[in-house]
């Protein structure tokens, strides 16, 4: 097995990760002899419930602030035996004063799931927390509430990058978070493959995630680390926007060099086609849309047979770690050419680097015509492909070397007939499908291109103007060093002037 441990850091990250886990749960098969194309052991772990029954829960750690978990409890139906609600007083014979918070009323969706009834349609109004549309049981060790800060607090907002750093340092000093939280899951793994981090990057969660990543690298230096860096896509007042921009700059400076993959994700995305019916004010809806692309591009990491996804990301030089997330919803009646059959990987000559997508979740412009692409990983799902037998027989390593020596972009394509399921936990009219619970075909991509250089240069300008003198030189120089690997030999000074 090649297991992955997931860390979910913050409210925005948990909205997205909840969709991710719901999708993984939907791939389970329950008929004898029916095998899922997904290897569930990659993300799920076997255990024993409170009543001795076998359990299968996500290998994940969910961090969020006080008040952010909604009705999700640390103990659930798998791990909680019924107990008498009347607690004894022990040796205390004095008067008791019991204080209780007003309980959060479970959503109708959750109540119906618990009772085995058909799930009602969700809406932006009925989803109050990410747990309102959660369909998965978690191990009690997965639920970690940080009580030092409260969700949406005006008195102590969890916004500054330094605040997240300080909180991690304090908690790690007191508890040793890796030893308490990560190690129990890691020691269960036969062959730990990677860590996957869903994390906010433009608020205090960026600082928290950066320090966590430092500790992971110290302890598990050779393991891959994939960072999905969530950032707000809506415009703010100038002062708040500058704070957000500096937080993003500090996050990418601290985490990108230590990551195997670092993907900035705008929530909501800057451009959405008219065929997508999106309420951009609803995190439930925007994260559902993002999950359709993210869950698709990560499919090769859990498909049978095993795929060396890390090699695909590294390209030929291993220099480029910042990727763009893009996707296109494909029409049902269109069949791609040059795609490999089965759950296959290919770099055949008929595969083309794609520069135009319906949705770009990293940058505002979905068009990529004028930039140089260094590496691209494409994942197509849901089609019956036209198979080019000669190209499949060609050695993939040889194909990559040909592209490298011809100064062509590194390109690897994956195909799976497993279409994307639109679950009842999704907005029912988000995608252009004729009926609810339909499946859709998606082309998603991770692309490393010279566009990243322009974004990093813009961060340098802001950092040089806003950041204090003690940190300014280190941050600006660090961003510059990262930028150089995305522009050398491909971008001129005039290109930057155009930006």
Swiss-Prot record:
Name of the protein: Protein dml1
Family membership noted in the UniProt record: Belongs to the misato family.
CDD domains reported in the protein's UniProt record: misato
Lineage: Eukaryota, Fungi, Dikarya, Ascomycota, Pezizomycotina
Compartment(s) where it occurs, according to its Swiss-Prot or TrEMBL record: Mitochondrion
Major subcellular location class: mitochondrion
Any single GO BP term: mitochondrion organization
Key words, A-Z: Mitochondrion
Biological role stated in the UniProt entry: Involved in the partitioning of the mitochondrial organelle and mitochondrial DNA (mtDNA) inheritance.
Cystines in this chain: none
PANTHER family tied to this protein: MITOCHONDRIAL DISTRIBUTION REGULATOR MISATO, PROTEIN MISATO HOMOLOG 1
Matching InterPro entries: DML1/Misato, DML1/Misato_tubulin, Misato_II_tubulin-like, Tubulin/FtsZ_GTPase_sf
TM region positions: none
Cellular component terms (Gene Ontology): mitochondrion
């Amino acid at each position: 097995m090649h297991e992955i441990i997931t860390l979910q850091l913050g409210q925005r990250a948990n909205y997205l990760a909840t969709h991710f886990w719901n999708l993984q749960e939907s791939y389970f098969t329950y008929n004898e002899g029916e095998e899922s194309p997904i290897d569930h052991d990659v993300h799920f772990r076997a255990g024993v419930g409170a009543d001795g029954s076998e359990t299968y829960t996500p290998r994940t750690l969910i961090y969020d602030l006080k008040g952010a978990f909604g009705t999700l409890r640390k103990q659930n139906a798998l791990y909680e035996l019924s107990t008498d609600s009347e607690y004894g007083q022990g040796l205390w014979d004095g008067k008791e004063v019991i204080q209780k918070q007003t309980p959060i009323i479970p959503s109708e969706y959750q109540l119906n799931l618990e009772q085995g009834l058909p799930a009602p349609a969700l809406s932006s109004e009925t989803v109050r927390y990410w747990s309102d549309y959660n369909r998965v049981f978690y191990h009690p060790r997965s639920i970690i509430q940080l009580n030092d800060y409260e969700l949406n607090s005006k008195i102590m907002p969890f916004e500054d990058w330094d605040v997240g750093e300080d909180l991690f340092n304090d908690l790690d000093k007191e508890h040793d978070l890796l030893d308490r939280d990560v190690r129990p899951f890691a020691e269960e793994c036969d062959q730990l493959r990677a860590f996957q981090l869903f994390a906010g990057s433009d608020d205090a969660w960026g600082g928290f995630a950066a320090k966590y990543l430092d500790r992971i690298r110290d302890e598990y230096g050779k393991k891959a680390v994939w960072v999905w860096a969530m950032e707000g896509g809506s415009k703010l007042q100038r002062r708040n926007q500058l704070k957000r921009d500096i937080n993003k700059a500090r996050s990418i400076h601290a985490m990108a060099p230590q990551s195997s993959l670092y993907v900035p994700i705008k929530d909501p995305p800057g451009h959405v086609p008219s065929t997508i019916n999106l309420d951009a004010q609803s995190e439930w809806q925007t994260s559902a849309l993002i999950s359709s692309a993210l869950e698709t591009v990560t499919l090769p990491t859990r498909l049978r047979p095993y795929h060396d996804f890390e090699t695909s990301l590294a390209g030929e030089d291993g220099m480029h770690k910042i990727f763009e997330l893009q996707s296109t919803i494909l029409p049902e009646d269109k069949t791609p050419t040059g795609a490999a059959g089965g759950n296959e990987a290919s770099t055949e000559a008929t595969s083309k680097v794609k520069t135009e997508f319906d949705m770009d979740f990293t940058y505002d412009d979905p068009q990529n015509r004028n930039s140089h692409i260094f590496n691209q990983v494409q994942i197509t799902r849901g089609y019956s492909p036209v198979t080019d037998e000669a190209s499949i027989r060609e050695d993939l390593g040889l194909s990559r070397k040909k592209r490298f020596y011809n100064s062509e972009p590194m390109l690897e394509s994956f195909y799976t007939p497993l279409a994307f399921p639109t679950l009842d936990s999704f907005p029912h009219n988000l995608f252009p499908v004729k009926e609810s619970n339909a499946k859709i075909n998606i082309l998603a991509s991770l692309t490393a291109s010279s566009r990243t250089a322009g974004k990093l240069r813009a961060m340098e300008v802001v950092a040089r103007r806003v950041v204090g003198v003690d940190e300014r030189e280190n941050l600006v120089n660090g961003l510059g060093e990262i930028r150089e690997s995305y522009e050398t030999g491909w971008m001129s000074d005039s290109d930057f002037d155009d930006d």
